[in-house]
Amino acid sequence: MYSLIEDIKKLLSVMLPILVAQISTAGITFINTTMAGHAGSDDLAGVSVGAGLFYPLLASIVGLLMAGTPLMATLLGEKKPEGLPYVVRGGLLIGLVISFLFGAAYVLFIDDLLTSLTLEAEVAYVARYYLMTMVGVVFFISMIVPLRCLTDTAGSTSTSMKLFLMAPPVNAVFNYLFIYGHFGLPRLGGIGAGLATMLTYGFLLVLFLIVVLKSSALKGHEIFHSILVKRSDVKEYLIVGVPSGLSIFMEMSLFSLIIVFLARYGTDTLAAYQIADNFASLVYMLPVSCSMALTILIATAVGAHDIPLARRYKKAGFVVALSGAAMTAAMTVLFRSSIGNMYTSDAIVASIAGQFLIYSAGWQLFDAISTPIQGILRGLKDTRVSFVLMVIAYWGGCFPMSLFLDHVVGLGADSYWLGLVFGVGCSAMLMILRLVYVERVMDREALPSFAFFMHRKITHPAAVHAVVASNVKQAKELLAFPDLYMQFSKENKFVFQP
């Protein structure tokens, strides 16, 4: 008889280091914004514009490359550690390609992009060269993420936590040197914040390389002893990673678009939205960290063909995520005025932010359902359908509902926060349906009538292969994409033996 408490302890042992690493990464952005602000308003505005354009793309890139986590965890669960170097090299290759594409896009489109924004000359100058430094940031992060996937799965999540904890103080030192121009270095203002960020991630990459190369368990020498990459590994990396990256991009781009619609309500409303959004983003790190931990644990359990263990981790994940969300939501509502005053001394802005924070509490509760399920499905390498469901929830639910509440019902700026709550609620509902469907397939039950998407299979246990085979006929009748199924089956040459 297993103990739920023991499973929760195991989940927390993986999750908490991830949470600390996430907070450390957020600390870099906070330090950049704060120190650039002291350099001048133009520097702060330039950094804000550059960061607003860059970070949705960066989050998408990280989401894509984090696909290495379930791939490596599955290999470890299957007792096939010799496959780790190929997956890592595949991730590094994809990272190199992404870095090249981002650099090429900067050269080709930066002039037209900044012109279309009609920024003041000083702000545009800072934004241009801040984004230039981000080319280096993309390269370093694209190299770090596959190595982090390796240390989190084959090693311990505490390793990446310790390394990321070094980043904020290092970043602060570089900011001090380059933003303000101390010790004979040029005073670069907001551009210096970008340069400091690039150097910080370069420093982190060196640390990750040292850790990987010194550990025999991480097979560092085997990774860099050869440049051989398996096409199948790269393909699987992209199959799992691209939908995850696109899901993040679609979600973050919606948040950016909402700012455009809120602009007509004035500066105070925009500032209040930024406060509530920033605080909600900090709280969001809790379910995201839980989701990442669930991906590692469930992928490892599934790789070992231990489906009951995967179910136990799923249950522990919901307990942790919902308990955490209940506490953060209650604290958000109770201390909303204090939170607003912590960000600004403007009483009007703080009051509006307090109202927005009430809505964010509802958002947190729905996120505690949706985000862990995404981690569970990633652990099962089920990401393509999740991406489609996220698009439906946010762009088919949240965005239209926000516009309806604003322009038809006339609720004003509150419409967009209510729309976000509705969108996250739709996402939670759709994720639950998807998880129920996947579990019914794994339980050898007939496909439910709402199974409008097929259960994608790549390298799951033989029992699951057999279950999928037994439902092929019914699945093809329910699916809107039978040709895609046939193409996938031929490419992977599945042989099912029920």
Where are these regions (language model features)?
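N-terminal transmembrane alpha-helices
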Residues: E6-T34, H38-A39, G52-L71, L96-G103, ...
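Short alpha-helical transmembrane segments in multi-pass integral membrane proteins
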Residues: M1-I18, M72-F139, L185-V242, I298-W363, ...
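Short runs within selected transmembrane alpha-helices of multi-pass transporters and secretion channels
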Residues: L65, M134-D152, S160-N171, A193-F208, ...
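Helix-terminus/linker motif at the lipid-water interface of multi-pass membrane proteins
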Residues: I23, G27-A45, L114-A121, L177-L188, ...
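Transmembrane helical elements of multi-pass membrane transporters/channels
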Residues: S13-T29, T133, A167, T200-L204, ...
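Small-residue-rich hydrophobic transmembrane alpha-helices
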Residues: L44-A104, I141-S160, I259, L270-R336, ...
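Residue-level hotspots within pore-lining transmembrane alpha-helices
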Residues: V20, S24, I28, L57-I61, ...
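Structural signal for membrane-spanning alpha-helices in multi-pass inner-membrane proteins
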Residues: Y106, C149, N175, I179, ...
